[in-house]
């Protein structure tokens, strides 16, 4: 598992839900989720596998070593199975501010799913 140098803990959990530093193994899942949910993202075209690998290599991987990275991305797990990803982006370390990024797997992203989206988002924020 990749480790963020700036974090003391690499796993945060509550019952069956957990977040861990984003994993290279989850890149393809995340790409599929992003392409299926472009309407809620700042993404103008579908990502190719090469686009995703390049982004992970050039943008995400360097953040693991940085003492104050511009973002912290996590894989969101339910019973150790990935159900989404997100984290803090555009981090302003000096003023202790950031934006939240959050995306659930497509099947769980429907807002009419008996409040599941709201519940999972709330739990994610708590982790």
Residue ranges and their predicted role:
Residues 34, 59, 63-64, 126-127:
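Hydrophobic, Leu/Ile/Phe/Ala-enriched alpha-helical segments that form helix-helix packing faces
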Residues 50-109:
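Acetyl-CoA-dependent GNAT
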Residues 1-53:
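A short, well-structured alpha-helix characteristic of acyl/acetyltransferase catalytic modules
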Residues 29, 54-58, 124-125:
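Alpha-helical elements of Rossmann-like donor-binding domains used by nucleotide-donor carbohydrate transfer enzymes
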Residues 112-127:
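Conserved acetyl-CoA-binding loop-helix of GNAT-fold acetyltransferases
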Residues 40-46, 107-115:
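Short histidine-centered catalytic/ligand-binding loop motif
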Residues 29, 71-75, 126:
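Residue-level detection of beta-strand scaffold positions
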């Amino acid at each position: 598992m990749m480790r963020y140098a700036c974090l003391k803990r690499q796993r945060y959990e509550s019952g069956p839900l957990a977040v861990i530093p984003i994993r290279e193994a989850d890149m393809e899942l995340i790409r599929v989720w992003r392409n299926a949910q472009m309407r809620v993202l700042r993404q103008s075209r579908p990502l190719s596998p090469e686009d995703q690998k390049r982004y992970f290599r050039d943008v995400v991987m360097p953040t693991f070593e940085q003492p104050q990275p511009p973002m912290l991305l996590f894989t969101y797990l339910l019973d150790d199975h990935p159900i989404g990803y997100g984290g803090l982006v555009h981090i302003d370390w000096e003023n202790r501010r950031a934006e939240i990024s959050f995306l659930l797997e497509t099947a769980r992203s429907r807002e009419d799913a008996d409040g599941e989206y709201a519940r999972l988002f709330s739990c994610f924020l708590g982790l």
